[in-house]
Amino acid sequence: MELDRDKKTFAYFWLFGLINNILYVVILSAASDIIGPSLPKSIVLLFDIMPSFLIKLSAPFFVHSIHYDKRIPILILLSMLGIILVSTRSLWLCLPGIVLASLSSGFGEITFLQLTHFFGSKSLTGWSSGTGGAGIVGSFSYLLLTTVFRLNIQLSLLLYAALPLIFLLYYKINDSIVSSQVYQSLDMPIDSSDGPIELLKSNGWVDIVKRLSKLVIPYMIPLSTVYLFEYLINQGVAPTLLFPIDTTPFVKYRDIYVTYGTLYQLGVFISRTWGHKLPVKNLYLFSVLQLINLLITLSQSYYYWTDSISWIMVLIFYEGLIGGSSYVNCFMNILKDVDPNEREFVLGSVSISDSLGTLIAAFLGIILEPSLCKHQIGTGRPWCRME
């Protein structure tokens, strides 16, 4: 019986993680199609991460006033409207659409990470695996639709618009899982809790800031730096990791960029699903390893020391493994080490870290990618300006 509950918990949170992150991934995969080859891909990353970062930054001060039941319709509406606007392919409609999808992704991550406090490690494993699955499903499905099946970009994007309705499965949790005494019930109004939410309301903003400051060194800095380095690679360097098209298995240069994204997401999925089986306490290890990956890719982009795309594809896959491992180990450490009365607050608050690192990478990438591309053109490698 308990095994069945664990399986259901994992399955539900796997789906929540998948749907919450899939539009974010699809939008990044479509970056070259949304803005074309002449503009930095980090512009899309900036619009895809800034709203998510802002809502995560402000959430500790207001999220306790919104019941979980009321959050789900908000997530669905934002996601569906966002991807519909993005599918228009008009830059001035795409960018607001990306903002709406980003708000949904950030608010969804806070919501479901906080819910793992009630459901335990199986829910966190399911969530982490699902978010990793969103990477591979999102990037691979977009690659399949646009590169293999050659569907037009607008139709390909519209096909994702119905997926947020899967969030409605949340309302089945009470019947299929929470009714068991193994789990804490979520039936009571969230603002009547005697736990961390009530503490938030009574202690005020100053106390919240003090509690947040205790999370910076053990959790926030290592997770932020991992995401900083990997998204500098993905959006700032990877668009310039190109080779003569006739030496690759691809038809267009944009196919190389989309394939890099798929390989990265495959690595993320594998490590987010099974990374908890190799627990790592010192999260700074992942920061160092990801920094090494960034330096290697920068040197390839600038000096072109290998003419084999295979080595770069392997490196991008490995980069995904490191990123996914960092994420799952960070939140697993929180579940194991943080006092239960603080855990819900900590899980929601630390989620800002990945967005912070990604946001900084977006700003840096706007400068980095054009600089690398300019250098490549000057040395006889004009591929970064080709489609």
From Swiss-Prot:
Extent of the signal sequence: 1-31
Membrane spanning residue stretches: 43-63, 72-92, 93-113, 129-149, 151-171, 225-245, 257-276, 278-298, 308-328, 347-367
A Pfam family this chain is assigned to: CLN3
Signal in keyword set: yes
Any single biological process term in GO: amino acid transport
Record membrane topology: Multi-pass membrane protein
Source organism superkingdom: Eukaryota
Location within or outside the cell: Vacuole membrane
Keywords: Amino-acid transport, Membrane, Signal, Transmembrane, Transmembrane helix, Transport, Vacuole
Function summary: Involved in vacuolar transport and vacuole pH homeostasis. Also required for cytokinesis.
Family per similarity comment: Belongs to the battenin family.
Protein name: Protein BTN1
Upper taxonomic lineage: Eukaryota, Fungi, Dikarya, Ascomycota, Saccharomycotina
Gene: BTN1
